[in-house]
């Protein structure tokens, strides 16, 4: 049961990344090392974020939810967009190629750094726990989130982007940056359970992805 549970969690967390890499055509471009470079950039950006948060936003120890403090902490996630832009600017090729390399490398690095050890240690335990299934599902949501964020960064950095599209792209980028903060606040205020919180995050991410996809198609069609 222990190895079976770990195998299920591992497959649920990692196989969608492998399938995305194969089905997106990145394997045909030999983009593996480009994804590795994106992962290294992720590590550097997260280190800078941790140093910044530890310096200017120490851990809140009060009993009341610090709304302003959490909002300011969430603003640091803008660094992720800057990092994604840096990765895409260093890769030559079509827009969809840049987006997938940056997003897949970024999301895979986050998966390895934040979920690999908990799955290896926890999912191999004697007792079954749903939280590791939830963690695996959440990793898939994160992959979609970073694909969406990369597409938004790619659109906003186009020098020939029509001014009519710019407000919509900026709004979607704002929602992407503060999505985690809004969801955390919503879960805290409504006292949602773990499954309800996961479902809410999946729905919000899905809506954001559909909106970004529609805008991306419009931008590509206009400039084609």
Swiss-Prot record:
Q: Which domain of life is it from?
A: Eukaryota
BP GO annotations: multi-pass transmembrane protein insertion into ER membrane; protein localization to nuclear inner membrane
Chief subcellular location equals endoplasmic reticulum
Tagged with keyword Transmembrane helix: yes
Which intervals lie on the Cytoplasmic side per UniProt?
Answer: 22-34, 89-98, 156-164, 217-224
One MF term from GO for this chain? ribosome binding
* Cell compartments where the protein resides: Endoplasmic reticulum membrane; Nucleus membrane; Cell membrane
Stretches that traverse the bilayer: 1-21, 35-58, 67-88, 99-124, 130-155, 165-187, 195-216
Write out the topological domains of type Lumenal.
Answer: 59-66, 125-129, 188-194
Q: How does this protein assemble?
A: Component of the back of Sec61 (BOS) complex, composed of NCLN/Nicalin, NOMO (NOMO1, NOMO2 or NOMO3) and TMEM147. The BOS complex is part of the multi-pass translocon (MPT) complex, composed of three subcomplexes, the GEL complex (composed of RAB5IF/OPTI and TMCO1), the BOS complex (composed of NCLN/Nicalin, NOMO and TMEM147) and the PAT complex (composed of WDR83OS/Asterix and CCDC47). The MPT complex associates with the SEC61 complex. Interacts with CHRM3, CHRM1 and AVPR2. Interacts with LBR; promoting LBR localization to the nucleus inner membrane. Interacts with DHCR7.
Q: Main role?
A: Component of the multi-pass translocon (MPT) complex that mediates insertion of multi-pass membrane proteins into the lipid bilayer of membranes. The MPT complex takes over after the SEC61 complex: following membrane insertion of the first few transmembrane segments of proteins by the SEC61 complex, the MPT complex occludes the lateral gate of the SEC61 complex to promote insertion of subsequent transmembrane regions. Also acts as a negative regulator of CHRM3 function, most likely by interfering with its trafficking to the cell membrane.
Entry's PANTHER family?
A: BOS COMPLEX SUBUNIT TMEM147, SMALL SEVEN TRANSMEMBRANE DOMAIN-CONTAINING PROTEIN
Family, per the entry? Belongs to the TMEM147 family.
Disorder cited: Neurodevelopmental disorder with facial dysmorphism, absent language, and pseudo-Pelger-Huet anomaly: An autosomal recessive disorder with onset in infancy and characterized by global developmental delay, intellectual disability, dysmorphic facial features, coarse facies, and behavioral problems. Affected individuals may have variable findings on brain imaging, such as cortical atrophy, thin corpus callosum and enlarged ventricles. Laboratory studies show nuclear lobulation defects in a subset of neutrophils, indicating a pseudo-Pelger-Huet anomaly.
Record protein name field: BOS complex subunit TMEM147
- Specify the species: Homo sapiens
